[in-house]
A protein has these predicted regions:
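Conserved glycine-rich cofactor-binding loop
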Residues: 10-12
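Conserved glycine-rich Rossmann-like NAD(P)H-binding loop of the short-chain dehydrogenase/reductase
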Residues: 26-41
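Substrate-binding pocket helix/loop in short-chain dehydrogenase/reductase
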Residues: 96-97, 101-109, 201
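Active-site helix of classical SDR
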Residues: 120, 157, 165
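Alpha-helical segment proximal to the catalytic Tyr-Lys
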Residues: 125, 129, 170-174, 229
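Residue(s) in the substrate-gating loop at a strand-loop-helix junction
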Residues: 141
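C-terminal substrate-recognition "lid" of short-chain dehydrogenase/reductases
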Residues: 210-238
Length: 243
């Protein structure tokens, strides 16, 4: 049974990824920061799609290193190591730089960048020691590649994710573990719903529309296939042709 952890999978892109991987036969371990019921609902949906036993959803704050380690170590002690991890969960706290407060900077960096370390540190060595030729996919963003007005903190964090992915991919390549990033553009999620002038944003996208969570999930699912075993250290953009 190939178990895959998908963080932030109670809604949005994370849930779409979880459901798509379940359709491909993976036993998906769902996760939420707070909403345990929603995460377990995702886990139940995944079990129906995959035909695999329903996995207990995990609940932890990625910025809390001790809590992340405790939850993951307990899960692996009971169920074994993961075949793959999709690091999707993240936060944003947008503001123009002159009024960007230190707390908003810390919140985003601690969750979106340091949280990636907190998540992967407990799971990578069990993958290596069990000779699992697995998959790690981290969600970055168009902001992490090109930057975005009002998102200095978020852009910095997501750029850092790309750097971490590229370095970790080199370290794990000889183990057969691939490490890649997927960088969505504007996707139809709760975050996109807060855009003040959506039509202006749509006109800036060559395809003249926002992407869907399912389109992002399809790219992640490809990276989990056997055919993608030679794809590592890459950043795949899903942005409708923004650049």
């Amino acid at each position: 049974m190939n178990r895959v952890l998908v963080t932030g999978s109670s809604r949005g892109i994370g849930k779409a990824v979880a459901l798509r991987l379940a359709k491909d036969g993976f036993a998906v371990v769902a996760h939420a920061v707070r909403n345990a019921a929603a995460a377990q609902e995702t886990a139940a949906e995944c079990a129906k799609l995959s035909g695999q036993p329903e996995q207990k959803a995990l609940v932890f704050d990625l910025a809390d290193r001790a809590a992340v380690a405790a939850a993951l170590e307990a899960d692996m002690a009971a169920n074994g190591p993961f075949f793959g991890v999709v690091a999707n969960a993240g936060v944003n706290a947008d503001a123009p730089f002159p009024i960007l407060e230190g707390d908003a900077w810390d919140k985003v960096i601690d969750t979106d960048l340091t949280g990636l370390y907190n998540l992967l540190k407990p799971v990578v060595m069990p993958m290596v020691s069990n000779r699992i030729r697995g998959r790690i996919v981290a969600l970055s963003s168009v902001s992490g590649i090109a930057g975005n007005r009002g998102q200095v903190n978020y852009s910095a964090a997501k750029a850092g994710v790309i750097g971490a992915v590229k370095a970790l991919a080199v370290e794990l390549a000889k183990r057969g573990i691939t490490v890649n990033a997927v960088a969505p553009g504007v996707i139809e999620t709760e975050m996109a719903a807060s855009i003040e002038e959506p039509e202006l944003v749509r006109r800036a996208i060559p395809m003249r529309r926002f992407g869907t969570p399912e389109e992002v999930a399809g790219v992640v699912a490809f990276l989990f296939r056997d055919e993608a075993a030679y794809v590592t250290r890459q950043v795949i953009s899903v942005n409708g042709g923004l650049f």
